[in-house]
UniProtKB/Swiss-Prot annotation:
GO biological process: regulation of DNA-templated transcription; regulation of RNA stability; regulation of translation, ncRNA-mediated
GO cellular component: cytosol
Protein family according to the UniProt entry: Belongs to the Hfq family.
Gene that encodes it: hfq
Identification of the protein by name: RNA-binding protein Hfq
Residue ranges of every copy of the Sm domain listed in the record: 9-68
Amino acid sequence: MAKGQSLQDPYLNALRRERIPVSIYLVNGIKLQGQIESFDQFVILLKNTVNQMVYKHAISTVVPARSVSHHNNNAQQQYQQQAAQAASAQSNETSSQAE
């Protein structure tokens, strides 16, 4: 995953998963509204009365109708696991030096 997408993907996924209505403003000023059906590295599929494939390079701003919790739980779990492994390794090293 690209470094720039580490915030983008969880945010868009939360909007998709919770079916939060969004307003998407394009760089040319056009406002699109709907729900995010799907997305990938390059496009967002926006659903309203019709489905629209919107290229991300044309998007200026994504505005949700309400607040969204977009914490990257997977990254947080990985960090906690790594911290626990490091603490365990340090504990094992300390106990073997004491013997």
